[in-house]
Amino acid sequence: GMEKGQVILQHPNGSNQKVPLERFAKEDRDYIAAREAKHAGAAKAVNEALGFPAFSDGHFTTRQAGEIAAAMQLPLESESPVGNSWRLYAAVRKSGYKLFGAVPYSVALYSNAEGMADSLSIVFANKGDYGSKAGFATEHFNHKDGPDEPTSLADAMQRDHDLIEKALTTALGEGEKQRFGDTGTRRTALRWDWNDHSFLLALVEGEYVSVQVVASSHADAGGRSGRISDADLRARLEASVRRKDNGDVWVSGIPMVDQGPKGYCVPATFERAMRHMGVEADMYLLAMVGESSAGGGTVVEWLIENLRSQVYRKGRRLRDIAAQDLRIRDLQRHVDAGIPLLWRMCSMPEYNEIADKNTGTRGGEGHAEWLASVRKDFAKRGKPAENHHLCMIIGYNEKTGEVAVSDSWGKRFELRWVPIELANWVNNGDLILIQP
C-alpha cells in the first residue's frame, strides 16, 4: 500500500517497512501508481458495500487499527501489550447501524502489538441472540427496505447471509468457497479477495452468520493462526508481572473483553486468557463452540473440552485445578509466572459491593478495621449457590491476605482486590489455567 508518498512493504514475519516512492525505478513507480489507482476505485465500492469509509487503497494490515475503528464508530475496548481491541454491540447500543446491508450483533476489531489492524470479526444473526430479551433490541429484524421480518432463526440467518453476499458480490464479484478456522470453529466460508486481504462470509447452520476480514495470507492458511515460541511467550509473561512495595503482585496487560448484555462470561474470559497466552480467539465464535443456547448462556464443560485441542495445537494446554479452599500460597507460583487463573465462582451482589469498596479505599482511614469485620463475617457464612460466573484471579498480596480479580465487564473491572475470606465464600472450587 501507499501512505503519504511512501510505499509500505510487508515482510514475511508480518512487520512493515516504509520506503519513499522515489527510491523505486520508473517502471516500478508506474506499476505502483497503476495498482493504487485500481485499488482506489475498488476501495470506494467496498466502502459502499460496508456502509462506512473504513477501507483505503492501503493494505488492511498496514493501517492503524484506530483509524478503521473511528471510521466504523467502534469504541475502544482494550489496550494491552499484545494488541488493542474495539467492540460494538450494535444491535442493542446503536440504532440504525448496518454493515453490508444487515444489522450486526457484535463488531470486533483487533490490532497487533504495533497498533496495526490484524482482523475484523462481525457476527450477525446467531442462536445466542435470537429471541433474547437480555437488552436486545428489535432493530435486528426491522428492515424497512426488505421482505417481511424473519419468523425463525434459520430465516434470520439466511436473510443476513443473502444481504451480505449481495453487497460483497456487487463490490468484488462472485466469492469462492473455502474452509476456514481452527479446530472447533472451522467452517465453510465464501471468500472475496481484494488488496491483499480477504472477506470471509460464513453461515453455520443453526449457529451464526459471520464476516471476518483478515490478511489474504491468513486466509490462504485456512485461518490457522501461527504459534509464538515458548521462550518468547515466557519472557512476555514474566514481563507482565507487576509488584508494589505494599506487597501487591499482579499480572498486567491482560486484554479486556466486555461480554456485553449476554451471559457470555465464559467465552469472554477464555478469549482474554487465550490472547494473553498468544492464542487468537473470538468471544462470539467461542460461545458457539460452548453450545450457547438460544438467548444466551454457555456450557462451560463443553466449551473447555472443545477448546483443549485448539489450545494444544498452539503449543499450549488447559489444566484444571481443584481448589475447594483458595490459598494464596497456591496461587503465587502461577501469578509470579504471569499466568492468570480462570476462576469459577458465584458473583453475588454483596461480593461485588465489597470488592468495589475495598479496591477504592485500600490504605485509607478506617479501612483496616472495616476489612477485619468483613473477614470475620464471611469466614463463617454458608456458601451461595446462584449467580454462577467465570472470571480471573490475576494477583495476590500475601501481607494483607487479598487476591486480585478481573471480570469481563469492561475497564472498571480490570483489577479489583478482595480479601481471601470473601473469595472463599463465593468460590466454586475450580480453577483453570492455560499454560505454555
Q: What are the residue ranges of the model-derived segments?
A:
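Extracytoplasmic
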Residues: M2-G5, N16, P104, G115-A117, ...
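Structured segments of extracytoplasmic/periplasmic soluble domains
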Residues: R35, A167-G175, E271-E280, N306-R313, ...
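Active-site-adjacent structural segments surrounding the nucleophilic cysteine of cysteine proteases
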Residues: V46-T61, A65-I68, E77-E79, R186-N195, ...
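Structural recognition of the beta-strand scaffold that forms the well-ordered cores
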Residues: Y264-V266, L341-R344, M392, A404-S406
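Predominantly the structural core of cysteine protease catalytic domains
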Residues: G297-E398
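Compositionally biased alpha-helical segments
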Residues: G1-S56
